[in-house]
């Protein structure tokens, strides 16, 4: 009983401040939205053409999801299940474009394809027939740079799928296409739905790409409105609408997954035999190389080229140095706070009967950045004016947005350790914290590092919430990129800062991928 009480006290101590910062912003938005009179809201909704905007965002999210799946799923199958040349290197390179935020991808393709861009100038024309600005261009960019999410989830599912099931199907006389359609794809359905949901919701709530490519969405309306007026009732009501639609999509996914079972009753899973591509081996490699070029090599090359056109680059970087330090300070602090809370939550929930705080943490992760930024700014202004308009507000915002991935990483690491390891240490006279420090912590360090890196990367690249919550004069690198790109266009200053941000994010992200890539054997 004392042990149970100890876990309950710990989890309650984590639950109360977490609930304060997670539910407080939502409560503020609900309260402000309730002050918006119904008739007035309907009139403003007509002025804003709200039904058309919602339909446009739904189209954007659908096109983005389909495009990302068309790119990421074949890439995962080729890398994991075929004798593709260099598959181990590709397995490491394919997720690396996640270090490039989609809004930087939009900047890259503006530099490359927009009127007056690199390609039109090279061809000697004013503009290209294709139009980068609009729903089509935004879907192209978002799908391209979100496809690694599909790749990660589907490749992981392919690695875990028992190949014996496919062997039985082949033994029953089914051809390769029939096995893929009737066995492999149904087993991949949870991963496909999960990845598709991530892409759909990201596109639905995106701000950076759609603002740069001039697509009118709920997020751009919310941001533009709060910049031009002190009345937050309408943007709060729109934020509630955006969040409600997000929750409906999440519930729909749970309903779809809940209707079917996905249990594989197997023992140890042996590696699947590689499918021989035969004459298609090198064409498949060319396809994969094209993917890596479009999502990684070309963006880096374009940013490097545009940055090289900057006069006095050293002086410019020196001037921008404070913004880099702002980004680093808030991202490191936000990641450290998130990991600390995640460790306490995962440990208390995994080692005793405790309050289930992790479910509360997921609320913040499901809220779009624009919505949380608006709610957090208003909530802190009303409840904690000492934190409002300081860098601490950004740190708390990053914690609420991204503590869930950290918690999942720590939980996964703890799940691999049996509680008897700590119990053995305690039987030798060590207390709970001493046993954790001496036994558990050294064994879960990789999981802790992975969770910290993930939150750091996400915080370092966050744009929408940062724009709204940041104190006056406290800009970060993403904010400066956006300001330069919106005010002047895809010019060298924006490209230089974008290159700095990508390289800063890529280093820790590559460390994670290096550990992960060891699970893929080289092609034979």
Pin down the residues of each PLM region.
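Membrane-interfacial helical/loop segments at transmembrane boundaries in membrane proteins
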Residues: 118-128, 214-216, 313, 473
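Short cytosolic juxtamembrane segments of multi-pass membrane proteins
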Residues: 165, 262-274, 421, 515-524
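Short helix-to-coil transition segments within interhelical loops
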Residues: 46, 82, 158-188, 215, ...
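Cytosolic juxtamembrane amphipathic/interface segments immediately preceding
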Residues: 2-7, 173, 270-276
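Glycine-rich helix-loop "coupling/hinge" segments at transmembrane-helix boundaries
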Residues: 111, 204-230, 463-491, 524
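Flexible interhelical linker loops that connect adjacent transmembrane helices
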Residues: 256-288
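Short alpha-helical segment immediately N-terminal to, or the first helix within
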Residues: 43-44, 157-158, 182, 198, ...
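Membrane-water interface segments at the C-terminal ends of transmembrane alpha-helices
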Residues: 4-36, 48-159, 187-207, 235-254, ...
């Amino acid at each position: 009983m004392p042990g149970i009480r100890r876990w309950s006290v710990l989890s309650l101590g984590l639950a109360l401040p977490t609930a304060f910062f997670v539910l407080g912003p939502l409560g503020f938005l609900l309260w402000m939205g309730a002050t918006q009179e119904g008739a007035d809201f309907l009139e403003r909704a007509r002025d804003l053409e709200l039904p058309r905007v919602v339909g446009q965002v739904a189209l954007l999210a659908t096109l983005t999801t389909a495009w990302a799946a068309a790119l990421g799923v074949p890439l995962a199958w080729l890398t994991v299940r075929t004798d593709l040349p260099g598959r181990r290197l590709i397995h490491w390179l394919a997720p690396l474009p996640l270090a490039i935020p989609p809004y930087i991808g939009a900047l890259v393709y503006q530099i490359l394809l927009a009127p007056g861009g690199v390609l039109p100038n090279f061809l000697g024309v004013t503009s290209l027939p294709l139009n980068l600005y609009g729903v089509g261009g935004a879907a192209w960019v978002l799908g391209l740079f979100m496809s690694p999410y599909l790749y990660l989830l589907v490749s992981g599912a392919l690695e875990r799928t028992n190949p014996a099931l496919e062997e039985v199907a082949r033994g029953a006389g089914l051809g390769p296409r029939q096995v893929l359609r009737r066995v492999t794809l149904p087993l991949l359905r949870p991963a496909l739905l999960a990845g598709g949901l991530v892409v759909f919701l990201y596109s639905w709530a995106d701000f950076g790409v759609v603002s740069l490519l001039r697509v009118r969405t709920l997020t751009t309306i919310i941001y533009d409105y709060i910049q031009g007026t002190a009345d937050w009732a309408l943007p709060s009501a729109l934020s509630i609408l955006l969040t409600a639609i997000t929750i409906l999509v999440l519930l729909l996914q749970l309903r779809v997954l809940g209707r079917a079972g996905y249990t594989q009753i197997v023992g140890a899973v042996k590696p699947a035999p590689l499918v021989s591509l035969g004459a298609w081996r090198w064409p498949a490699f060319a396809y994969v190389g094209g993917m890596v070029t479009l999502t990684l090599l070309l963006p880096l090359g374009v940013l490097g080229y545009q940055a090289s056109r900057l006069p006095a680059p050293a002086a410019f970087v020196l001037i921008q140095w404070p913004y880099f330090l702002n980004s680093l300070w808030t991202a490191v602090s936000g990641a450290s706070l998130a990991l600390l809370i995640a460790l306490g939550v995962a440990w208390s929930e995994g080692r005793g009967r405790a309050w289930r705080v992790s479910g509360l943490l997921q609320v913040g992760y499901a809220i779009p950045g624009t919505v949380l930024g608006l709610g957090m700014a208003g909530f802190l202004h009303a409840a904690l004016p000492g934190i409002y308009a300081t860098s601490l507000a950004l740190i708390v915002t990053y914690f609420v947005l991204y503590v869930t991935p950290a918690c999942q990483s720590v939980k996964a690491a703890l799940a691999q350790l049996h509680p008897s390891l700590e119990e053995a240490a305690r039987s030798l006279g060590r207390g709970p914290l001493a046993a954790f420090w001496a036994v558990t912590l050294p064994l879960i360090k990789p999981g802790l590092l992975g969770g910290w890196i993930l939150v750091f990367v996400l915080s370092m690249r966050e744009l929408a919430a940062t724009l709204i919550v940041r104190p006056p004069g406290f800009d970060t690198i993403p904010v400066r990129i956006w300001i330069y790109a919106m005010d002047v266009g895809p010019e060298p200053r924006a490209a230089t800062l974008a290159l700095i941000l990508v390289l800063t994010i890529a280093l820790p992200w590559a460390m994670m991928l290096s550990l992960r890539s060891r699970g893929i054997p080289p092609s034979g």
